[in-house]
């Protein structure tokens, strides 16, 4: 006769694959989860921020690996092939002191980036050039998406009127071809994590390819690239600044805060997937910000922004400023704080304009700007496509941007299998389960109660899993069973549906042991 032991483990953490609620219900379980996230945030802040960097040599030794990790966490390692851009101009319009080229390029075959290139009406020599990346502006007319670039045209106009080239690029989510950023935010696409995909990586790649294109233009001085954008565009400014040292000055606006704000204070609930890399290496976000060093960096924010609160922004600024100080470049980092909410505001714009005047054109720090950014162009006139290309893959980019992993060849002998399985286990621990505790503490098991019904014995134990979780374990077996007689041990880790089924099966007979 086959002798079996059934172990049922009830986690305190029951997660459903559904959109995150606007307000997390206040329950004992959720309070426990909040406590867990607070503990993890404190651990990450202490161990994976910038506190361990004490000398310039420390930073210079570690920064290349940090940059490689960021490429990986954005789904860009290995980097996609740089295929022909197939840049195409579809039209042009003229304004007071500037022209706008309406164009598109393909960051990879079929992945279209729609863009407007703003230039002064007279260009006599290569110009400092701004890559402007867009936030979540929805610009639609008669059911047709004009792209979020049309919501930020006033920035392009200002730069062109003041001696810059400026390219404004659409995002995949809110461009003329509407793709998807909200995979885990609201679409239940949890497989993005397993695939190693985040739309943040796709937008970073669009930025890299935009620079590739701009380098081909005679109007562009490729030694003087700057990047800016607000909200989502602030985040993409961070990605390209950290990844690509062709960016010589940056002014990300309302695009970053620290783990305390995001996790403990709950700001993450208001954010799109495109705002985050897949945090395999458990970074605090200041590490990504510091990859701008020692290049000129202006961190721009408002004092009443509820999704990028100023306290977290200031903590990041203070910690990253230490890196600039170690590198002898403290004058290259600045913090611009203006009054207001999470909104495109003129004082924020002026700060960015002044920063680029100083660091891309050599203007004096007391230089006075003659005007702010003014909206003057009808959005519909900036549209690039009259028809959406039939070969576009923007609408399914999440399925192709990060290639699927290829199944490895099976081992053919015991030695190869041992080596292969050891490698897999190391990779699983380093990547998939990197958040597990490194030191396994005592589980402190405690027998709570036991009962026998109709020859079946159930025993309940409590044990420590990982701080702060103390879990319940139910052991079910034939009464009188000896350990040495066991032939099979089955461990069931129960989700909510499994717990409901377990209760339906056993509660009528073992109700005193089972806490419902």
Regions found by a protein language model. Give the residues of each.
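Conserved hydrolase catalytic core segment
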Residues: 242-248
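Cap/lid segment of the alpha/beta-hydrolase catalytic domain
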Residues: 124-222, 256-268, 274, 485-516
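Alpha/beta-hydrolase fold nucleophile elbow
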Residues: 219-231
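Alpha/beta-hydrolase-fold serine-hydrolase catalytic core, especially in secreted/extracellular enzymes
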Residues: 17-113, 125, 285-287, 293-295, ...
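Alpha/beta-hydrolase-fold catalytic nucleophile elbow
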Residues: 170, 228, 253-254, 300, ...
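Mobile cap/lid helix-loop segments that gate and shape the active-site cleft of serine hydrolases
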Residues: 193-194, 202, 248-290, 294-295, ...
């Amino acid at each position: 006769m086959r002798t079996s032991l059934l172990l049922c483990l009830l986690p305190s953490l029951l997660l459903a694959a559904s959109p995150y609620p606007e307000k997390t219900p206040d329950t004992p379980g959720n309070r426990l989860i909040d406590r867990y996230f607070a503990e993890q945030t404190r651990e990450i802040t202490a161990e994976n921020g910038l506190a361990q960097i004490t000398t310039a040599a420390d930073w210079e030794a570690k920064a290349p690996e940090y940059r490689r990790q960021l490429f990986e966490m954005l789904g860009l390692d290995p980097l996609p092939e740089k295929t022909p851009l197939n840049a195409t101009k579809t039209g042009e319009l003229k304004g007071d002191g500037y022209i706008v080229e309406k164009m598109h390029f393909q960051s990879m075959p079929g992945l279209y980036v729609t863009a407007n290139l703003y230039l002064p009406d007279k260009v006599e020599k290569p110009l400092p050039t701004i890559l402007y990346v867009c936030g979540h502006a929805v610009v639609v007319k008669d059911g047709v998406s004009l792209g979020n670039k049309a919501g930020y045209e006033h920035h392009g106009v200002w730069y062109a009127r003041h001696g810059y080239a400026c390219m404004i690029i659409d995002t995949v989510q809110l461009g003329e071809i509407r793709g998807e950023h909200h995979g885990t935010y609201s679409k239940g696409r949890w497989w993005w994590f397993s695939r190693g995909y985040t739309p943040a990586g796709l937008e970073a790649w669009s930025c890299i390819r935009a620079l590739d294109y701009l380098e081909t233009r005679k109007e562009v001085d490729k030694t003087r690239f700057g990047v800016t954008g607000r909200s989502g565009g602030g985040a993409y400014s961070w990605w390209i600044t950290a990844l690509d040292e062709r960016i010589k000055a940056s002014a990300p606006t309302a695009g970053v805060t620290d783990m305390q704000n995001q996790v403990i204070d709950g700001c993450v609930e208001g954010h799109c997937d495109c705002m985050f890399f897949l945090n395999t290496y458990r970074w605090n976000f200041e590490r990504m910000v510091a990859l701008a060093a020692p290049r000129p960096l202006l961190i721009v924010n408002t004092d009443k922004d509820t999704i990028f609160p100023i306290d977290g922004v200031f903590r990041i600024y203070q910690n990253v400023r230490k890196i600039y100080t170690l590198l002898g470049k403290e004058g290259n980092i600045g913090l611009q704080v203006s009054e207001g909410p999470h909104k495109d505001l003129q004082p924020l714009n002026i700060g960015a304009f002044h920063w680029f005047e100083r660091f891309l054109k050599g203007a004096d720090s007391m230089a006075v700007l003659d005007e702010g950014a003014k909206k003057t162009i009808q959005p519909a006139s900036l549209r690039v496509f009259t028809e959406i290309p039939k070969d576009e893959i923007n609408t399914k980019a999440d399925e192709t941007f990060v290639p699927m992993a290829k199944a490895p060849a099976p081992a053919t002998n015991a030695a190869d299998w041992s080596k292969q399985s050891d490698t897999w286990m190391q990779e699983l621990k380093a990547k998939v389960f990197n958040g597990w505790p490194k030191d396994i503490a005592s589980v402190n098991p405690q027998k709570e109660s036991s009962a026998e019904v109709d020859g079946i014995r159930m025993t309940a134990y409590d044990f420590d899993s990982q701080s702060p979780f103390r879990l319940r374990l139910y052991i079910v077996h034939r009464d009188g069973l000896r350990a040495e007689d066991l032939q099979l041990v089955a461990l069931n880790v129960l989700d909510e549906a499994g717990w409901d089924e377990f209760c339906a099966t056993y509660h009528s007979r073992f109700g005193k042991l089972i806490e419902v």
